[in-house]
Amino acid sequence: MSIKLTPTWFIKEYSSISIEFLKKQSIKTIFADIDNTLVDWDELDTNDTLQTWVQQLKENHIEIILVSNNRKNRIERVAEQLGVPYVFPGLKPLHKGFKEALSQTTATKDEIVMIGDQLLTDILGAGTFGIKTILVKPLKLSDAKKTRINRFFENLILTILYGKNYSEKWEEKIHD
């Protein structure tokens, strides 16, 4: 079970993931969570850093598909601002959202990575679906009420898997 809860990579934030790294890993498609992964959970709009990163992905023929458990209007708003497709409902960690996202791309599972901030939804779901994963630190220390219980168990699991200093696992940057 721990293998499905073990991310392929730890990275502090999405914007530290370089195009060169993705190409070296033969990644053609990114499935990405929204809240506290790409956008602060309590912010409505995307920011310039995210817009630039997504534009760089597009220029390098790396597609991004949003897979979120949030409300449809939230997902649509972010997807529209970024000009990317999305899946609703995500239903992570179940495979329904991942299957739908896979049907929207020509990439194989080996060419896809899921980027998310939650071990029990993003990483577990993608891991059991058979795709690579990047666990990022949440953009904000606070969470929506519905997420707080997950965070408690995630911290417990990460401590069991990696020890008290598991936060040292996060890389500053993935570049090559």
Positions of the model-derived regions?
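Asp-based, Mg2+/Mn2+-dependent phosphohydrolase catalytic module
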Residues: 2-30, 43-44, 51-62, 67, ...
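Active-site residues of response regulator receiver
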Residues: 33
